[in-house]
A protein has these predicted regions:
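N-terminal leader/linker segments that precede catalytic domains of diphosphate-processing enzymes
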Residues: 1-160, 166-287
Length: 287
């Protein structure tokens, strides 16, 4: 059975205990300005935490072809951020919204919310961190199925081009942390930029995918999406993860592991100070 490493257990415990500061502006936002993403963690066979990431379809209007967490806009103001994130994860990668439909023996635990971020489209985005793990009451001591093969089985070809995972702790490191041979190329680079008159650290991570099963959509006749088939190999050897997603990964890893990154970064978690100062523009969608 898969056992969490001590540092992975401690990371989950920190996230479970974390409480983000109050953010009253969220309640004043219309549904059209609200969004949420699912930062889904799970343990690999070595007990290390990995995080699920998608590549957005090239056909999407916003952020096409970029790496992102499963997530999207609110349907109504009655949806909680976690409900938004879980609904979008169902639509994008087939992760059931109903916990009772998660394949046994797995459960999804909502660990915490991270402080809000501001997308270039003016959406206020709430990251929801969750942990996919076996339910102790359903484990009989036998070998657990591989999460990559069991829990990410279906894609929506209209929204997702690929689903892959990345080593969570590595988002605090300037170089590849995985053991064994890795494909050529760097893991990290970064630069400072100006974002709404704020200095904002732009992180670029290049995630190796040569030793994992990357799930992609398969097209039925007529262009309709069918069951996705995992590919043992792909032309790419690294996927670029950057922008708001990269910033959220750094923030989440900092909180989880209680460590600071090996590279320069923004001290604040999220963009809540910026969002509060830009409230009128956000509400008027002038960003």
């Amino acid at each position: 059975m898969i056992r969490l490493l001590t540092k992975s257990k401690a990371a989950i415990a920190r996230l479970r205990a974390y409480q983000s500061p109050p953010f009253p502006l969220w309640d004043r936002l219309p549904a059209t300005r609200r969004a949420a993403v699912l930062v889904l963690l799970y343990a690999d066979r070595a007990g290390e935490l990995r995080v699920v990431i998608t590549m957005r379809s090239a056909t999407l209007r916003n952020f096409s072809g970029q790496a992102a967490f499963p997530g999207g806009k609110a349907d109504s103001v009655d949806e909680s951020p976690y409900q938004i994130a879980r609904r979008e994860a169902w639509e994008e990668i087939g992760l059931p919204m109903d916990d009772s439909k998660i394949p046994a023996p797995f459960v999804i635990e909502n660990l915490c919310y991270l402080p809000h971020s501001l997308a270039r489209t003016g959406l206020v985005v709430r990251p929801c961190v969750a942990f996919l793990h076996p339910d102790p009451t359903k484990v009989d001591g036998s070998e657990l199925p591989n999460v990559d093969e069991t829990l990410i089985p279906r894609l929506d070809a209209k929204e997702v081009a690929a689903v892959f995972s990345a080593p969570f702790h590595n988002f605090l490191k300037a170089q590849d942390e995985e053991t064994g041979p890795v494909p050529s190329g760097q893991w990290y680079e970064g630069r400072w930029t100006d974002y709404n008159d704020y200095r904002w650290r732009l992180h670029y991570f290049y995630v190796p995918i040569d030793r994992q099963r990357v799930t992609r959509p398969k097209e039925r006749e007529g262009g309709q999406a069918a069951l996705a088939e995992p590919e043992e190999s792909a032309p790419e050897v690294r996927f670029k993860v950057w922008g708001m997603t990269g910033r959220m990964l750094v923030d989440a890893a900092r909180l989880a592991y209680g460590e600071e990154p090996e590279f320069e970064h923004n001290e604040d978690y999220g963009d809540e100070k910026m969002i509060n100062e830009l409230e009128s523009q956000i509400l008027e969608t002038k960003l």
